[in-house]
């Protein structure tokens, strides 16, 4: 373990969360929060060449150190036989990085790089934290807590012994003033400046079931005076009826939304999947949601959003039950009733954990100073 940071030595924190945005964004949010509290801190991100971190981390102004990926097979297969060798290589490289940056604390967020980070931190006697964003903990994070890491979780009953802190959300989302940006955001996307607006997204690749249902509901929503901003996915296409294309309020369809901050500011409600990071960002800005959990995996997407729906901040529609009629049934009463909408917005905000990144940063700094 590194000695307590001296006054003339910078605090050194390593964040490990590569692969998908769901692992990287919480890591970056915590990195930003540590930097806000300790501006001179040295922050290093661990990643691999396989993940989105190769672009996302440098774009946020943090140092990225690459290690060999170690995906842990969930089933018995040929990859299991090579796991020990791959893990040894990754562990050796991770130890090198931790020594080089004189790490005081390590925090992992799951994904390919977390297991080597936890093992290396334990071996070098560096205090480490394990953050689980999903409702059901992954293999790497379960390992991390068993190795002695301090568990932090987004929700109860994740399968980890952990303190509930929520999901760290980036500062740009936390500081988003939707009311102040509303007019600019609506002009940016070319949607109606006044009509209630439904934001629709199935993620960067889109979701066919969501696309089909919302297109089916398009005329009914338009007749009810509701506009739509629909990101249908780069690999998909949709065909709107001519009467909808020519009608008002406008139905604006785009393959992908680069300025999601402006989309959140423009919208009055969102229809989307319920990945952990999506739920965290939507709740952080107080946007009521109609959530359609991904129908695959272990059901974690539905569990991710349960705290929001139980609080009254949104509803869940199962993918198999998603139709144009059901979309209209949920969206129109929400967006045409100001009292109902306001209650849902406040419930969404209350159910979130806007201070998650700040709290985690405080714990990291306290562990380093102990």
Swiss-Prot record:
The protein's matches in InterPro entries, at most eight in alphabetical order, are given as:
GlcNAc_MurG, Glyco_trans_28_C, GlycoTrans_28_N
CDD domains, A to Z: GT28_MurG
Report the pathway entry. Answer: Cell wall biogenesis; peptidoglycan biosynthesis
The EC designation for this entry is: 2.4.1.227
Recite the UniProt keywords alphabetically.
Cell cycle, Cell division, Cell membrane, Cell shape, Cell wall biogenesis/degradation, Glycosyltransferase, Membrane, Peptidoglycan synthesis, Transferase
Does this entry carry the keyword Membrane? yes
Enumerate the GO terms in the molecular function aspect.
UDP-N-acetyl-D-glucosamine:N-acetylmuramoyl-L-alanyl-D-glutamyl-meso-2,6-diaminopimelyl-D-alanyl-D-alanine-diphosphoundecaprenol 4-beta-N-acetylglucosaminlytransferase activity; undecaprenyldiphospho-muramoylpentapeptide beta-N-acetylglucosaminyltransferase activity
* GO BP, sorted A to Z: carbohydrate metabolic process; cell division; cell wall organization; lipid glycosylation; peptidoglycan biosynthetic process; regulation of cell shape
Topology in the membrane? Peripheral membrane protein
Catalysed reactions, semicolon-separated: di-trans,octa-cis-undecaprenyl diphospho-N-acetyl-alpha-D-muramoyl-L-alanyl-D-glutamyl-meso-2,6-diaminopimeloyl-D-alanyl-D-alanine + UDP-N-acetyl-alpha-D-glucosamine = di-trans,octa-cis-undecaprenyl diphospho-[N-acetyl-alpha-D-glucosaminyl-(1->4)]-N-acetyl-alpha-D-muramoyl-L-alanyl-D-glutamyl-meso-2,6-diaminopimeloyl-D-alanyl-D-alanine + UDP + H(+)
Per the similarity annotation, which family is this?
Belongs to the glycosyltransferase 28 family. MurG subfamily.
- Give the protein name, as stated in the record: UDP-N-acetylglucosamine--N-acetylmuramyl-(pentapeptide) pyrophosphoryl-undecaprenol N-acetylglucosamine transferase
Please report the organism this UniProt entry assigns to the protein.
Corynebacterium jeikeium (strain K411)
């Amino acid at each position: 373990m590194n000695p307590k940071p001296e006054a003339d030595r910078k605090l050194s924190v390593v964040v490990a969360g590569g692969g998908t945005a769901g692992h990287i964004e919480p890591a970056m949010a915590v990195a930003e929060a540590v930097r806000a509290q300790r501006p001179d801190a040295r922050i290093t991100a661990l990643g691999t060449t396989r993940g989105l971190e190769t672009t996302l981390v440098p774009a946020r102004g943090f140092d990225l150190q690459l290690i060999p990926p170690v995906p842990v097979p969930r089933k018995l297969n040929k990859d299991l036989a090579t796991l020990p060798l791959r893990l040894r290589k990754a562990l050796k490289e991770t130890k090198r990085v931790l020594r080089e940056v004189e790490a005081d604390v390590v925090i992992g967020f799951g994904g390919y790089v977390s297991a080597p980070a936890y093992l290396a931190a334990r071996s070098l006697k560096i205090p480490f934290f394990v953050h689980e964003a999903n409702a059901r903990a992954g293999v790497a994070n379960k390992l991390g807590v068993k190795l002695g890491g301090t568990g932090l979780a987004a929700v109860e009953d994740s399968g980890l012994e952990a303190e509930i802190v929520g999901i760290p959300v980036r500062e740009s989302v936390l500081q988003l003033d939707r009311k102040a940006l509303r007019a600019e955001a609506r002009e940016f996307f070319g949607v109606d400046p006044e009509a209630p607006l439904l934001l629709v997204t199935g993620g960067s690749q889109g979701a066919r079931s969501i696309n089909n249902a919302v297109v089916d509901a398009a005329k009914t929503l338009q007749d009810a005076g509701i506009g739509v901003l629909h990101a249908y996915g780069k690999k998909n296409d949709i065909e709107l009826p001519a009467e909808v294309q020519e009608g008002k309020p406008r139905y604006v369809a785009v393959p992908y939304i680069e300025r999601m901050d402006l989309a959140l500011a423009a919208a009055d409600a969102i229809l989307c999947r319920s990945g952990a990071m999506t739920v965290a960002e939507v709740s952080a800005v107080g946007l009521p949601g109609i959530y359609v959990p991904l129908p695959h995996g272990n059901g974690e997407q539905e569990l991710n959003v349960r705290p929001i729906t139980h609080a009254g901040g949104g509803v869940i529609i199962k993918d198999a039950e998603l139709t144009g009629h059901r979309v209209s049934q949920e969206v129109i009463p929400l967006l045409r009733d100001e009292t109902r909408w306001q209650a849902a917005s406040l419930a969404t905000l209350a159910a979130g954990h806007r201070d998650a990144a700040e709290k985690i940063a405080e714990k990291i700094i306290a562990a380093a100073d102990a």
